[in-house]
């Protein structure tokens, strides 16, 4: 498989990857929009909001082939199927 080239870690002063920067901006916006409200499940919210479009887009790219999508994601096919069911994407 042709994986995207890895980028250096931004903690060493190298530029951030575009995806990482988009995620950071979205998280900052979400936290700002909380406007002082308490949220004790931010990790779960962010994970869900990232995984759903990730799975949808990778499955579309793989023309619905779950085995190929799981391989592309680097997870076991059973894990992908479990997540798809959990998110109501089956």
UniProtKB/Swiss-Prot annotation:
Stretch list, region Disordered: 1-22
Keywords, comma-separated and alphabetical: DNA-binding
Gene3D superfamilies, per database record: Homeodomain-like
GO molecular function: sequence-specific DNA binding
DNA-binding region boundaries: 66-85
Top-rank taxon, per record: Bacteria
PANTHER family referenced in this protein's UniProt entry, alphabetically: DNA-BINDING PROTEIN FIS (PTHR47918:SF1)
Family: Belongs to the transcriptional regulatory Fis family.
Protein name, entry field: Putative Fis-like DNA-binding protein
């Amino acid at each position: 498989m042709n994986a995207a080239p890895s980028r250096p870690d931004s903690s060493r002063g190298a530029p951030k990857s575009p995806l990482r920067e988009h995620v950071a901006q979205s998280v900052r916006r979400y936290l700002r929009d909380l406007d002082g409200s308490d949220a004790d499940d931010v990790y779960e919210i962010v994970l869900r909001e990232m995984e759903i479009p990730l799975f949808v887009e990778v499955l579309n790219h793989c023309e619905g082939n779950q085995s190929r999508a799981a391989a592309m994601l680097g997870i076991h096919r059973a894990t992908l199927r479990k997540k798809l069911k959990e998110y109501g994407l089956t």
